[in-house]
Amino acid sequence: MSALPYAWAKAQRILLRTGEEGAVLTVCPSTPGWSISEVRRQFGPARLERVRDEELDGLLASAYADTGSAAAVVGAAENEVDLDRLMQDIPEITDLLDTQDGAPVIRMINALLTQAARDEASDIHIEPYESHSVVRYRVDGTLRDVVSPRKALHGALVSRIKIMAQLDIAEKRLPQDGRIALRVAGRPIDIRVSTVPTGHGERVVMRLLDKQAGRLQLETLGMDPQVLAKLDNLIRQPHGIVLVTGPTGSGKTTSLYAALARLDASTSNILTVEDPVEYDLPGISQIQVNAKIDMTFALALRAILRQDPDIIMIGEIRDLETAQIAVQASLTGHLVLATLHTNDAVSAVNRLIDMGVEPFLLASSMLGVLAQRLVRRLCQHCKQEDPAAPGSWRPVGCAVCNHTGYSGRTGIHELFCIDDDIRTLIHQGAGEQALRAAAREAGMFSMREDGERWVRSGATAPEEILRVTRDA
C-alpha cells in the first residue's frame, strides 16, 4: 500500500512504497522531477527505482487495489449518515480510487465495489431484514457475508446505488434495472443493477462484469485437449448450429465469447444478439435486446439476416420463434452459436423438439452441443491430501482463500458431436437414452468423468465435482 493519494500518484506517475527495508520510490521516464523532490521532502529519503511507463501502470494498479475495505468503512458510515448530502447532485465517478468525496455512505459504496472487484466477486447482494441489512458477495459461485450495516443505513445505501445507476430513487414499489460503468484501479467494470421491493425494504443485486475478463481464450477455460480440438473444428464449419448448455452462472456466455474470439472477424461478418451485452468484442457488431420497445431476440435475428452475416451468436434461445429462426439461418448458409438451458448436452435435442422444432430440421442443422459446469479450485496454500481417499485432496481453509478452502474456478465439459448415425436417430425421433448411448459409443464422456482429471491432478475435490453434476 502506498502512502501517496492515488489520484496524485497516478497524475504524477510516481509510487511510494514502505517496508521493512525502508522506502522505495518508483518512477518512470514521464515522472516530473519536482514530484520526486516533493515526495522526498514530505516523507524523507527513499531508494529510487526506475521502470518503464507501462510497468508503472501495473504497479500503481496493484498497490492501490487494496484501498478501502468495506468492513473498515461501515462503522464510520453508520455514525455519520447524512441523507441530505447523499441526495444532492453527486459528481460522476470515473475511477473509484480517484474520488475524494468524504460522504460516509458514498465512501462505503465505493469500498464495497472496490473490495468486490478485488475479491473477483461476480455479484453483490444488499438484503434488508427486520433489524439489519446484510451485504454478501458471490465469489466462485457461492455467497458469503461481508458486512451487516444497521437497518437505518439501508435506505441510504440503496438510494446511492440507484443514483449511480440512474434509477428513480422515489419509486420503491416496483422493480428497476439499471447499469453503472466505472473503473476500479484502472480496470473497467460494468455493473448491472437490479432492485426489487420486499417487506423490509428494497433488495439490490449488482452483477459485476469485468470488461477484461471477456478476452479469455478457449485454451484458458479448462477444456480437455480432445474436447477443445473437436469444438474448434465445429466452430469453423461454414454453417450449422453449435449450442452451449448449462444452468445460469455456468460460464456459457464466456465460452461463446472465447469461441468468437477464435474466429477471424476481419474476413467474416459476425453479429450477436444478447440480453444484456456483457462484454465488448472488437470487430463484432453486438445488438442489445430491449423488451420495453419490443426489441426481442426474434425481431433482432430477422434484422440480422438482412445484414449479410456469416456468423450469428444468440445469447439465449428462449422460445420457439427464436429457435425456428436460428435453425432456418443455419440451413441457409450461416454458422449459429447459441446458449440453451439444459442439464446436459444430449437433452438439448429434446428441449428444442419440445419447443416445437421439427426433428428433421434439427437433424439437418445441428453440429454439436457443449455442456459445462464451473467447479471451484482447491486453494493451493492450504489444501491437504485426503487420508481416506489416497490420490485426492480436500479443502482446509486459510486467510488466502478467506477460509473457504477454494480459490478460483475452472470448467468441466461434455461435447455431444452430431455424426451421421446420430442425425438418423434425431430424424427418427429417438429418445435421450438412445442418443446418449450413440454419443458414448462415438467417444463422448460426461462432465463427471471430465471432472475426474481435475481430481487426479489435485486441482479440486471429489465432492466439488459431485456438487455441480448432481443434475447432469
Task: Give the ranges of each region predicted by the language model.
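Residues that form generic nucleotide/phosphate-binding pockets
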Residues: 42, 59-63, 73-77, 86, ...
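Polyanionic, low-complexity intrinsically disordered segments
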Residues: 1-42, 56, 61-67, 80, ...
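Core structural elements
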Residues: 9, 79-88, 126-133
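General small-molecule cofactor/ligand-binding pocket signal
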Residues: 47-51
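A generic structural signal for alpha->beta connector loops
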Residues: 43-45, 267
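Short, flexible helix-loop junctions that flank or precede catalytic/ligand sites
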Residues: 98-472
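Alpha-helix initiation and N-capping motif
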Residues: 36, 53-57, 66-67, 80-83, ...
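Charged, low-hydrophobicity low-complexity segments
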Residues: 53-111
